[in-house]
Amino acid sequence: MQEHIQSISFDGREIRLKTGLFAPQAGGSVLIESGDTAVLVSATTAPGRQGIDFLPLLVDYEERLYAAGRIPGGYLRREGRPPERATLISRLIDRPMRPLFPQWLRDDIQIVATTLSLDEEVPPDVLAVTGASVATLLAGLPFYGPMAAVRVGLVGDDFILNPTYREMMNGDLDLVVAGTPDGVIMVEAGANQLPEADMIEAIDFAYEAIQELIEAQRALMKELGVEMVSAEPPAKDEELEKFIGDRTTDKIKKVLSQFDLDKNGRDAALDEIKATEIIEAIEALPEDAPLRLKTTEEPKLIDNTFKALTKKLMRSQIVEDGVRVDGRKLDQVRPISCRTAVLPRAVHGSGLFNRGLTQVLSIATLGTPGDAQEMDDLHPSDEKRYLHHYNFPPYSVGETRPMRSPGRREIGHGALAERALLPVLPPKDEFPYVIRVVSEVLSSNGSTSMGSVCGSTLALMDAGVPIAKPVSGAAMGLIKEGKEVRILTDIQGIEDFLGDMDFKVAGTADGITALQMDMKITGLAVEVVAEAIKQALPARLHILEKMTDVIAEPKELSPAAPRLLTIKIDPDLIGMVIGPGGKTIKGITEQTRAKVDIADDGTVTIASSESENAEKAKRLIVNMTRKLNEGDVYFGKVTRIIQIGAFVEIMPGKEGMIHISQLAEGRVGKVEDEVAVGDEVVVKVREIDNKGRINLTRLGIHPDEAAAARVAAQ
């Protein structure tokens, strides 16, 4: 393919699509640029694998630090494991792309987006999402696109399309919307308690802008002569469908209408139907029967056909009868219970949140500024002081499997709950602690990420973190059959698995703090998205009421948490406080058993579980950094002796010299006649010369001054 460049004027900013220049062996590739940000996106396919029942799509977002003119740290000086933010962008690309491939497709598909250049004004993530659609179209894959994504910010009362990093950090909204000609397909947002009406308006604003990028992709494909591919699905196995349907339809309906069954009971009943009514019946067929031969060769045919029938019957029950598998109404929340302080007080704060069979235990830990996470990626922020980690062990769903490091799902769910709480956390200057919350999913039946939001709120309040408002969350679902649409409140596992939407909404009583919407269909009208947001509000408020019944206000700071004291020193004195090789600051730590962190601006944070130790460290640092004045009296220790005098450490890291003539009244023959190394002496600052050298004396000190100096030193 020859090089081709298409420019799009998009809200006053140019977006360039360059094809035919890079990655000639990829199925399709595009370099998408805006400003000085450039992202190379490729889409490649390989022949399918036998015996799988899922779409083998792999999406990778890669960051290269050369894009920002930086060399990686570490011994190897090269990029290692993708940072968390890169994993989140991989998910951001995957989520709108996955539902646009035919679900019967079994070819391996890999989409790789690599940031080659970074402009601090233009984030690369939404460019990568749009680029994934372009690359896939160029690769000639079956794809229900085009698809595009935009970001919307809110500064003051104005929505901003594709805001800069600075506008994002200073605004009240960070919203990413992906859409197709059929509607909205993905939403990701963090907001500062934004009212529902404003969020809906922002999504509508985004979807209108998306249409320009969709039309640009269509125009590009037309210019390049690329035809849209719409492959036909494989023929259905009507014989197997009829065989299974005739034997199990009524029995499945009966199970789905047994509202007293919990998740495990329902799963067991459905497994029993499959085993006795299908598998045994097929095994009873003659060995050469076509149906038996077919299912023997492809055992997953039975599972897939049975699941498809169960899905159809469950959806029909919801659409036609307005009843869910557990008997709830469409807008009804499962039973909720909450507890705080469920762990011993060695833990700073804990909260247990139960919603139906979903149970999340969240634990809050308060640390010092030195515990902040340093970020080594392309994002301009250099550290995080609030961390949320989400764990999903196999026992939470009654399974056994090896325990691994967190996967993309765990990282994504943790980031969503983190984003939901950020707007209500106290500012650093009011609450200098670094905060880590870990959410342990102990039992899962849907909406564990929103359970983590609720559990985190309980744990933070239990730890004594003065959050502005409590935050709750609910997961909304959707069943769409033709023109019939049903929105479900607080979906459980089977409704998530067999439904068309998973829409997580978190916020306070005043507004939304986080959104995440994923679809299994090719798009949803903005009006339906708006209805889901509105329906989530009473559910969130109901959950908030249950939470505040247990803990209405943050408690006093946990007695197990370190006590922090903060002081400011002259940045020029930081080196003196640290000392050569860290000697001075280590001495303070050993002497007081307090942890000391010093920021580049001279902010010193002192942490200790004992207030007295923190105060002692504070006095030491204040004394050693205060400006010395002639006439000040100190109680110090002789550190070394020379022929003409003795050096005395009057505070950690600061020494002065007593000339031999100032050691005592009258003539002194030898310094050693008056003092020895290790002696503790009272001295007065006699002079500070123009080089900053401190001259001391033992003469002319009043007994009251000496006594005060001894007390101050202690």
Curated annotation (Swiss-Prot):
Any single biological process term in GO: RNA processing
Native source organism of the sequence: Picosynechococcus sp. (strain ATCC 27264 / PCC 7002 / PR-6) (Agmenellum quadruplicatum)
Domain S1 motif positions: 631-699
Cofactor(s) listed in the protein's UniProt record: Mg(2+)
Record function comment: Involved in mRNA degradation. Catalyzes the phosphorolysis of single-stranded polyribonucleotides processively in the 3'- to 5'-direction.
Ranges for domain KH: 562-621
EC code: 2.7.7.8
Binding site for Mg(2+): D496, D502
GO cellular component entries: cytosol
Keywords: Cytoplasm, Magnesium, Metal-binding, Nucleotidyltransferase, RNA-binding, Transferase
Subcellular location: Cytoplasm
GO molecular function, one term: RNA binding
Matches recorded under Pfam families: KH_1, PNPase, RNase_PH, RNase_PH_C, S1
Keyword presence, Mitochondrion: no
Catalytic activity: RNA(n+1) + phosphate = RNA(n) + a ribonucleoside 5'-diphosphate
InterPro entries, sorted: ExoRNase_PH_dom1, ExoRNase_PH_dom2, ExoRNase_PH_dom2_sf, KH_dom, KH_dom_type_1, KH_dom_type_1_sf, NA-bd_OB-fold, PNPase
Entry protein name: Polyribonucleotide nucleotidyltransferase
